[in-house]
C-alpha cells in the first residue's frame, strides 16, 4: 500500500527545488501522487477495504489543497508540475 522509502527518495530528489527540500509544494504533491496511485492499485484488488479508502480520500483532499495553494502562489510552477505528473488539470 505505502510507497517504499527508496521510491520516495527518488521522487524527492526529482522534484526538490534545492538540496534537502522536502517541504516545497512540488515535492509534497509528487509524493502524495505516488501514494495515491499505490493506494488506488491496492483498492482495485481489495475492494472492501474501507479504511484504506478513507485514507485515499484524505490524501486526495490534501493534494487538492496543495495544488490550489501552488496555483494561487505561482501559476507557472503549478502548470509545470501538473504537466510533469500527468494530472488532468
Swiss-Prot record:
Q: Which InterPro entries match?
A: Ribosomal_uS15, Ribosomal_uS15_bac-type, uS15_NS1_RNA-bd_sf
Q: Name one GO molecular function term.
A: structural constituent of ribosome
Record keyword Transferase present: no
Instruction: Please give the biological process terms from Gene Ontology that the record holds.
Output: translation
Q: Which SMART domains match?
A: Ribosomal_S15 (SM01387)
Question: Has keyword Ribonucleoprotein?
Answer: yes
Look up the record and report any one GO term of the cellular component aspect: cytosolic small ribosomal subunit
Q: Which domain of life is it from?
A: Bacteria
PROSITE patterns, sorted = RIBOSOMAL_S15
UniProt keywords (A-Z) are: Ribonucleoprotein, Ribosomal protein, RNA-binding, rRNA-binding
Q: Which family does it belong to?
A: Belongs to the universal ribosomal protein uS15 family.
> Any idea what job this protein has?
One of the primary rRNA binding proteins, it binds directly to 16S rRNA where it helps nucleate assembly of the platform of the 30S subunit by binding and bridging several RNA helices of the 16S rRNA. Forms an intersubunit bridge (bridge B4) with the 23S rRNA of the 50S subunit in the ribosome.
- Assembly notes: Part of the 30S ribosomal subunit. Forms a bridge to the 50S subunit in the 70S ribosome, contacting the 23S rRNA.
PANTHER family found in the cross-reference section: RIBOSOMAL PROTEIN S15, BACTERIAL AND ORGANELLAR, SMALL RIBOSOMAL SUBUNIT PROTEIN US15M
- Provide the protein name: Small ribosomal subunit protein uS15
Q: Which organism is it from?
A: Lacticaseibacillus paracasei (strain ATCC 334 / BCRC 17002 / CCUG 31169 / CIP 107868 / KCTC 3260 / NRRL B-441)
- Gene symbol here is rpsO
